[in-house]
Amino acid sequence: MLWKRWTLAVTIVVLQLAAVLLFARGFLPSRVLLPGYTESRVSTEAPFQKAIIMVVDAFRSDFAFSDQSNCPQLHKRINSGGAIPFTAHSTPPTVTLPRIKGLTTGSTPNFLDAVLNIAESDNSSTLANQDSWLAQASRDGRKIHMFGDDTWIKLFPGMFDDCEGTASFFVSDYTEVDNNVTRHIDTQLDQKTEWDVLILHYLGLDHIGHKTGPESPFMPAKQKEMDDIFDKLYNSCDDDTVLILLGDHGMNEVGNHGGSSAGETSAAMVFASPKFETAQLTETAETSPLPWTDTYKYHSRMDQTDLVPTLTALLGLNTPKNNLGVLVSQMLGLWSPEDQLNVLKNNADQMVQILQGQASRESDAKEVYELYDTLNSNPSVKDYYNFLYEAQSYLTHASSNYNTNDMLGGIGLGLLSTILALTVFSALTLAVQGLKRLYLIILLVYFISVFGSSTVEEEHQIWYWITSGWMAFLYISGSRNKFGDGFNWMFVQVFVRMMISWNQTGQKFTKKDDIVTWLSKDGNHPVLWILILVTYGVAFNKVWRYGFSKVESKLAFLLTLITTFASVGFKITQAWEAGEVVPAPLLYLMGLPGTLNEVNARMAGLARFAFSTIAAGSLYRVLSLAGTDKVNLIRDLHAFLTLFLITQSRIQNIPLFMVYYFLEIFLRKATNRSFIFSSRDIYQTEALFQKLVLVLSVSTLLLEQVSFFSMGNSNSMASIDLSNAYNGVTLYQIEFVGVLTFVSNWIGPLYWSTAGLSFLLEDHVRNAIFAKIAEKNNDVKLTTKLVQQALTLRVYVVLAFSSVAISAVMITCFFLREHLFIWTVFSPKLLYQFVWTVLQFALVDVILSSIFVVLVYRSV
């Protein structure tokens, strides 16, 4: 029976994976695009012959235009009329690859591009066969040179006459990655006849944001560096060259991006040329800098896709076939009144072709067609813009090409896995109907919450209340017989409250004060580092007592000291390199400061050494399985995992592991005292057994959810943390970076997953009680059987939740696929749930649990 249930568990996992893949195929298809290239020739004279495109990754509008920016040369050019500034709206997902697609083709990228964005070697997103302003320039015989982010080379293979790429995801480096671009400038400016378009894409500012946020002490210097480069390029321009400075997206308050907040969607865009100073393109003179505002709206507003028809018109190129951008009106002064109408006509004729491919005249696009018809008789500039903006709005918000059959098929498989998981779960918990009903209510509450955009954005609030309520229920039920037996639950609640208060997340309260904010304030850094060192002391004790417990005592102490010191040294060096305040004695201990290259090399070496010793110790412990030692395997591996997870954490989150440690202790004590020592039914094996397993399994599952959000995560792609994704990595390798990215963002769930296994399999009090039960029943193998059954029930607790969760999210995305927030709220939630389902629940909680069953309890 046991192995049948495990076979069914594997079947449920397969059903979930199939559901995810099938639904994704239907929900995330590529947008239908018009094939081919625009062939008609532009009849108007081009104001410029050359263009320099300077992309500063994550160049938020306030970095360029506010009184808090450090770009004096840019402000000077704006005030003189030589530069025309805009705040350019970046349509989510606000990550580099889809934004470059939008900036070159003029079309709105598919949300799947956000997933492909992290695959450095991915070629599925190439634009080699799509129309873009680069394709039009190349077909017109123009020469294009590109230096910087290698995403351009992946998107446009073979299109550059000269190029050199830099790795866009190696966020640990923000100096050399920009120097490798700047070193080409002098040569390129001296050889202007060799190119018609020069593209420079700088990544350093974005990397600083990922590492230390927009208020990093390194940010002003980086802005000044970009400003100096802009000034150098501007001074090299003649009246035939236009310089465009832009950000591909912005960043949020912590330096990440991918979501839809004002900071992430507000990028800087500047058109500059000496010709503008005499052309007087704007009616009123622009002034810069402007007062900082949290709306990030400065100067005129435009959509990023508007760059495409504007640039092609400025260079005398055809507008790409799938462009949804509108030529910015501020540039019209460069043409005669007659040519102004001609360039707008080109834009309108191109856009109406897309409209004809997506909607008939009898559809809801009828009013847009009527505006186009008015252009047939003496149209004015205003008439053209009326049509262009209405067409842009309609086409931008037009429905995606969903495959509803695949979506329904995925939902069907998800519901089937839910039915199977809940059926077996119910059969395994017949003796604890009350607890089972409460868990099912939790699943129902979560299922309902997924249908609200606000509850998805603030999901952490759901788990905070559910977890606190669950622990309160256990406190009440555990102290019915003797009040003192429930005393430990009070400490459990205290530490849960500390987890909740550690990081503010979500959308509504992200700027509210939390524990991390207090620890980061001036004057409080000594407290932070004391807590960090105490946490490392706790981790040292766990690794020494448990991780190297099978090694001779003195050698174990030495190995633990070396392993822990490597991790501590790495975090100290990483903090200093990121601009954090580090106490002088710790800097002296690590021989800091030093040159940047020395520090980076030292960091990589320390991280690799720490990882190697942790891996070696874990491998030794697995290979040393023998006799009764096997029952402590998970506890010992959990000690090594804790040190690894600390190494992968942000500095401010390291003390959370001390909170986890004490919560783990009190949760273990609370369950033992409340449900074993105080139990009146000590010999009622089934009821006691099911109660214990369900209490611990649900508790640790809830703590997985709470700990995920307590680390500062959310359901927004902007909260993905890349600051520890390159620890120990010197060259970009998607396999290692992918694993480290998952680990550094799922730290809490990984911790509580292994802690939950240890609770069930290796608690000596519980096993002693089970031994007594076995003795009472005259069955010497009953203890091992109970442990195996406990693991089985835990797996089905997880499968019940994961099946309900993925089904709920897929159903939500199906019925709300026309919702205003489908791409900004529900689609990111779907991607997060995919990761939860495939990596955390299926791989970690189910498959690894199965491996432990085989490794540790093979005797039955």
Swiss-Prot record:
Membrane topology annotation: Multi-pass membrane protein
Protein name per the record: GPI ethanolamine phosphate transferase 2
Primary location recorded for the protein, binned into one broad class: endoplasmic reticulum
Entry EC number(s): 2.-.-.-
Enzyme class: transferase
Subcellular location: Endoplasmic reticulum membrane
Record note on disruption phenotype: Defects in hyphal formation.
Gene name as annotated: LAS21
GO MF terms held by the record: CP2 mannose-ethanolamine phosphotransferase activity
Positions glycosylated per UniProt: N123, N180, N672
GO biological process, one term: GPI anchor biosynthetic process
